[in-house]
Amino acid sequence: MRVCRKTIVSSMASSPHILFLFMGASNLARGYSLLTRHISSCFGKNKTEFLNALGPGRGFCARGGMFNFTYPPIQDCRILEVAKKKSCDIRVVLITDIGNDLMYGVLADTLIESLDGLIGRALQWDAEIFLTSIHVNLKKDVSPTMFFILKSFFYPGSSITYEEADMFIIKVNGYLEEKARQNERVYLISGMKSFTGMDKIHYSFLKTHSAWEKIANEICHVLKVPVQKKMRLADGISSIIANLYRLIFCDMFRFKKKGREYF
């Protein structure tokens, strides 16, 4: 991990207002409550504010979702426009759960262009940007038969082939690695594959807390903030239940509205 710049260290001493933007899909949705609670506790007296664009099946440049509800593409949901107008001292961006777009038939180059646009706009604010790569190594982790089963269940109607998916994943991951090498404010978090469950896509229920602890600790390390406590299995399960509540009561049946931080 690169050494944090002095500007962040000196700013942290003055108890700044820190704005976090979290963008992703199902893994982020499950861990969102856990992640925000943990970061808030680590930053203590500093004012923290969160905005998010998340949800199962969500894409960055394609509309996606599950069952009877869909989400707009993250690039079109206005989270960046709102974040730009916020008055804050430090902006932190997390872009994770990349890959749904490919399964919806979006070409790798199109997804890369979308991600590059999001990252470029965040860099204009001098944001600290954290990325996670697509952690599936298709040829090693998923057989063609299992790929067909997963595609049929999560992405019915998708026409992408096993070979195309493998090629696209390699290309997108290559872009993410190069982006992190080229920009001192862009950080690529690796090693997330070790937290996945049987489908090799989603974090295991028993390891969700560990996955988000790793990501939160990387963010705290860059911002020079000490980690106050470890995440527990019970915290992860509680966050998953909170996500299930949002899915059922807010997204599926719309009995309740989500908070203003949801895009």
Question: What is the predicted role of each segment?
Answer:
Residues R2, S15-L19, K200-I201, F205-F263:
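Conserved catalytic region of serine esterases and O-acyltransferases that act on ester linkages
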Residues S133-V136, V186-I201, K230-L233:
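Acidic carboxylate-rich catalytic motifs and surrounding loops in phosphoryl-/glycosyl-chemistry enzymes
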Residues T48, A127-I129, V186-Y187:
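Hydrophobic anchor at the start of a short beta-strand
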Residues M12-P16, K84-D89, L123-Q124:
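Flexible, charged surface loops at secondary-structure boundaries
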Residues I95-M103, R121-A165, M192-F195:
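Active-site segments of SGNH/GDSL-like serine hydrolases
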Residues V142-S190, T208, W212-E213, N217:
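Substrate-gating cap/lid alpha-helix
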